Amino acid sequence: MEPEPVEDCVQSTLAALYPPFEATAPTLLGQVFQVVERTYQEDALRYTLDFLVPAKHLLAKVQQEACAQYSGFLFFHEGWPLCLHEQVVVQLAALPWQLLRPGDFYLQVVPSAAQAPRLALKCLAPGGGRVQELPVPSEACAYLFTPEWLQGINKDRPTGRLSTCLLSAPSGIQRLPWAELVCPRFVHKEGLMVGHQPSTLPPELPSGPPGLPSSPLPEEVLGTRSPGDGHNAPAEGPEGEYVELLEVTLPVRGSPVDAEASGLSRTRTVPARKSTGGKGRHRRHRAWMNQKGLGSRDQDGTRPPGEGSSTGASSDSPSGAEADPDATALQASEPPAEALGEAPESCLLSGEAVGGVGQGAEGPPGTPRRTGKGNRRKKRAAGRGAGSRGGEGTSLSPRDKEETRQQEVLVSLPSPSEQEPAECSLVKEKEDSGKQESESKEELKPADEKEPARPEDYEPPEEEIRESEKEELTPQCTAGSTGPEWFPSEPSTQPLETVQNVKGDSLPEETPPVSVLDDPVVAWDLMASGFFVLTGGVDQTGRALLTITPPPPCLPEESSPSQETLSTALRYLHSLLRPDLQLLGLTILLDLRKAPPLPPALLPALSQLQDSGEPPLIQRLVILIHEDPPAELCGFQGAELLSEKDLKRVAKPEELQWDLGGHRDLSPNHWAEIHQEVARLCTLCQGVLTSVRQAIEELEGTAEPKEEEAVGMPEPLQKVLADPRLTALQRNGGAILMRLRSAHSSKLEGPGPAELYQEVDEAIHQLVRLSNLRVQQQEERQRLRQVQQVLQWLSGPGEEQLASFSMPGNSLSVLQETELRFRAFSTEVQERLVQAREALALEEDLTSQKVLDIFEQRLEQAESGLHRALRLQRFFQQAHEWVDEGSARLAGAGSGREALLAALALRRAPEPSAGTFQEMRALALDLGSPAALREWGRCRARCQELERRIQQQLGEEASPRSHRRRRADSASSAGAQHGAHSPSPSLSSLLLPSSPGPRAAPSHCSLTPCGEDYEEEGLELAPETDGRPPRAVLIRGLEVTSTEVVDRTCSPREHVLLGRAGGPDGPWGIGTPRMERKRSISAQQRLVSELIACEQEYVTTLNEPVPLPGPELTPELRCTWAAALSVRERLRSFHGTHFLQELQGCAAHPLRIGACFLRHGDQFNLYAQFVKHRHKLESGLAALTPSVKGSMESSPCLPRALQQPLEQLARYGQLLEELLREAGPELSSERQALRAAVQLLQEQEARGRDLLAVEAVRGCEIDLKEQGQLLHRDPFTVICGRKKCLRHVFLFEDLLLFSKLKGSEGGSETFVYKQAFKTADMGLTENIGDSGLCFELWFRRRRAREAYTLQATSPETKLKWTSSIAQLLWRQAAHNKELRVQQMVSMGIGNKPFLDIKALGERTLSALLTGRAARTRASVAVSSFEHAGPSLPGLSPGACSLPARVEEEAWDLDVKQISLASETLDSSGDVSPGPRNSPSLQPPSPGSSTPALTSGGILGLSRQSHSRALSDPTTPL
């Protein structure tokens, strides 16, 4: 047998997991190719073995667990839950992250190199800038496709609840709410029924208000066999879902098999949901566990109550408990009803008073059955649950789903009483048309065939019945009869039906809501007695076979049936047949073997039916006799007299009952019970149908209301829901039709009851849809009214108030009052805008949306204008205050020295600067206020006037600068005479008495402190008081020390700093020219301002939306486009959230910019990723056809999206280089940070190309993404033994990879994998030969010894590689040492080495290292965890030299002794004793030749290069 090709294996696996494969193939194969190409390097076999086969087992387990709770159903989508026809639910590859919105997620099988593929949930991270992957644990497969699982995920999320699942399809990505996805659909196929099991099935657990208990379920529902599963499985009823009337399949006429399967065709079912009072996560999967059995058959063969209506519990096994052996185990695992808080009132009472649908005319267990009586059945409807109805199996639009969500509950309104389960689903029995007729008949044998016979005429006294009923009145929940329904919306609550609580031995006196009367025409007692039996078989000609067995002699008080009664019964039996069988007529078999007396009216009735009708009802009359026929038959015409042995000429044994020698075991009593209920069901259906049609006509004829109306349930629908007949029909209809299938004549009967029932179902569904449409129209009108009200308010009062803020006022007090009013107005507007936008969320009214946006923009403009006017008025107020205060000081100072000091104080006061005036003038021009411009001119004139007065007072024109300098020099000499610690006297004693009080300086003004020239003046004018003069000068509220100069660059006065700018105490150092410093600071601030402005523009550009690639691009280019946009989105988040704020924080300290860049070095590595993706896009776009390429270039966003990040990177580098030139030589740390930042930015382009080269490696089975960061990539000439070749070498943190340049694919280079080594096994010899370009890498842990000599293209490349490898090996050695110490401590050994007591000469090996050889290699050959001793730090190159004659074999030394020798070597190679415990390893400097230690930290010794044997094993490159 030939092995299956890989392609066929992949397709067969996908076809098994995702049926139908012809619909899912386009989506799945595209995902397969994507994963094969990206993850498995186009290796289909490895993909199949490592990914697809494990994924198949994982997905099969998920599917099995999800479908286990619906055992017995026929799924509408056969691939659920993995796919819904062409829509794939569980993805095999990642979806484009741009399609994810808040609340969206999707499931994916994620490949992994280290382990088997796993299932993961992918969604947007809380920040929104990246995709978050949440692994799904294997134990979650049992409840993955449940609402509870997603609720558990949402509990762990801080923000943003997940609710919508993404499905991939050939047409694109689809969105489906999780609540709908976890609810599978079930549909009919080939006219067969679907549902749970062919029995009375468990009701749903209502999801009522909190605190209401859940009712236990009857155990009889467990005894059914699911089709195809091979074992009995419990059926699960939906929990709190929308329930409708079960619909019935119409059989194909003329087909006995199809007629036999007449029943439900559309069972709309929503799976179970967790009830409000649930006790656990899996409560929805255990809706059937807490159940009470109804008992088994009595020993005398009587059927227990409920068994007459349950086919599942009795068709395959003697009792419901035996039919499902797991039922008792499941029941034992559930707590009792009392422990769960379930009150006895929530359960119904089994017995005569309140029997469930599963009960017929029988009494409680242990009570003999009373036949021929129908009065006790009238009370049975009181104990049946209520159901709900609505919806349709066909899918609705999303709009309909949303609007129908409120109406789902309409048909299942809860009543204010206790809960009662009220739903019974139906199961579809799939029958194979190719089976033998006998096999199909055997499958449909009713429960009565295996029931032992019991005398039907036995009837106990009435007292005995009551006594047994009193004993058996126990709380019992009964199954309802309505079926679940598929409806693609949210689940609704389950109806609660009022139940009777029977206390003591009294029965409820209340009548049921519907009085179900017996049919006054059909004699059901006659049917139940076995007088007329429609056997369900046919004769040799295909006519339906009906047997007549006259009863024994009647009691005197009982009268014989009349001719009309007999004729009516026969006509009723004939009417039950299918239309084709009605045309053929009946074959009557009159059994007179026991020679009973014939009822007088029997023969006239038969004769009448033989002659009447066209065609006649009775086509053939066969009389079975034992001896001579009775005298009454002598004159009867058209009868055939046969003996028992001649019956085979009439019908086959399979068509006859067992007392006639056939194989059929019939139960006339059971048949009569079922058909009596069917007759009452038809009466109910007709009444409900009339009521529903009237409601439909009323809804269709209702005109739209002119005034405002409340959104709610329409009144016609409320009337229908309040009709008790609908409740009774929902409660019993489905179960009755289900029981009808268990009758022995069901395959011959027509679809009349099912058609009528389905007609009611469709009418109710039409009513619900009309009601939903009405509610939708009401909500649309309500939303339209809300929008209109908001628009009217905006155009009326809102517009008036907004216009009032256009001219806010010309005074500060008025503006402040206006600001308060504007805040209240803005809050009101925002509330109305939010209300209108919520109403427009489901509409596409662009005009109204535009009106709202325009008004909001005008509101923002008004707010901006108001704030600018406030700022302008505050400036005017401060300027006037400064002028008034200065004028008052000058006026109050008088003349002389006091006036001079006041002028000096005002000269240093924080006057408004010229720049501030220009800024305020620009504000006034923007506001367009002439009054503001006039006020600005007035303020400027007053300030200039005050400045002129100050200049006049000081007399600067007559006072030369040299005079002030001479006074400054004299002040310096006078200060020296006072002593070094003598403080300068203060001017506060002169300024404070004449000053009205200190004032705080505005932040935008500057303060120029007093210089030394005026300090001397202060010395002369202010003698010391009490020997302790004040140490500071208090000027306008600011304290400045007398020995400190505070410089503000915005101060217009410069002469103050001239006296001390060049001294050693100056703030800028010794001998730096002041103007040069100012120029440098100004340039630095200019560069930082330009950098911040550039960053703001860049953030704005990144926030612009970027369109998705068009369909003309290849799938690979679209994926690369998506990856580039993903990196761009992460850059947007980083720059907008973090980096811009940090740059703004560096505005006052320009030279800190370099540290800011270095602090976010990891984030700037994203630019390398962007460079990689951009180069791939450029090469891919260059390979496109000219037409496609031209269409791409026409897109305006493509060039900016591709070029903007790299242009910004170059702009960063230029600004940092200029800032580095402006930094003084004395700022060494800042210059180093700036230089490192420039280098970081320049490396990104090269790192991006390196990453692109890593992806271009072909044939490598190692996942290079898991080998750490790529450190270097360069071409080398590699020498291995006698072989010399050119290789491109990649150095990762954990791997060294050799590759060969192959060529270009689509404009990019590709490399072929040759060899790879773990860096943990690597040793380094830094110098080989005399060229200065070679170094050696060797590996001890692999074979005997492998060594590779690498010749670089330049000394710089060689130094770069050796330095990086040395640092890498040092880090590994230090890390391994720490791990080894931890292991020793955990073993109780400790971290101090054990020292043998030996002679010093034996322990000292360093003396051997003092030889002077020309050159040798110092490298490392010890692997991880081999030795525990600490390493020797600080070794110099000379200390590691060995004599040339020493061979490597001579150094087979005890490594532990080497590590225990606690000695250090000085730089000259001499031995010096060291500490007992050496310090930790320190990496060498990049330029040094210190040997690099690999894992273990033990110094290994190697011989010279020329002494290596040529026979050493090597690995070909």
Curated annotation (Swiss-Prot):
In this entry, which stretches build a coiled coil?
754-792
Role played: May act as a guanine nucleotide exchange factor (GEF).
What is the designated name of this protein? Rho guanine nucleotide exchange factor 40
Q: Where is the composition biased (Polar residues)?
A: 490-503, 1502-1517
Give the PH domain ranges: 1263-1370
Domain DH residues, every copy: 1083-1251
> What Pfam family does this protein match (any one)?
SOS1_NGEF_PH
**PTM-bearing positions, type Phosphothreonine:** T367, T1490
Query: What taxonomic ancestry is recorded?
Result: Eukaryota, Metazoa, Chordata, Craniata, Vertebrata
User: Basic and acidic residues bias located where?
Assistant: 426-457
GO CC term, one of those recorded: cytosol
Where are the residues of the annotated region Disordered?
A: 194-238, 254-514, 952-1011, 1464-1517
Q: Where in the cell is it found?
A: Cytoplasm
Which organism does this sequence originate in? Mus musculus
Compositional bias of type Gly residues: which residue ranges?
Answer: 353-363, 384-393
Report, as the record phrases it, the tissue specificity of this protein: Ubiquitously expressed but enriched in brain. In brain, it is expressed at higher level in olfactory bulb and cerebellum and peaks perinatally (from 16 dpc to P0.5).
Q: Which stretches are tagged as biased composition: Basic residues?
A: 370-382
Q: Name one GO molecular function term.
A: guanyl-nucleotide exchange factor activity
Segments of skewed composition (Pro residues): 200-216
Key words, A-Z: Coiled coil, Cytoplasm, Guanine-nucleotide releasing factor, Phosphoprotein
Record-linked PROSITE patterns: DH_2 (PS50010), PH_DOMAIN (PS50003)
Q: Where is the composition biased (Low complexity)?
A: 306-320, 332-345, 970-994
Q: Which residues cross the membrane?
A: none
Mark the residues carrying the PTM Phosphoserine.
S262, S415, S929, S959, S1080, S1431, S1436, S1472
- Entry annotated with the keyword Zinc: no
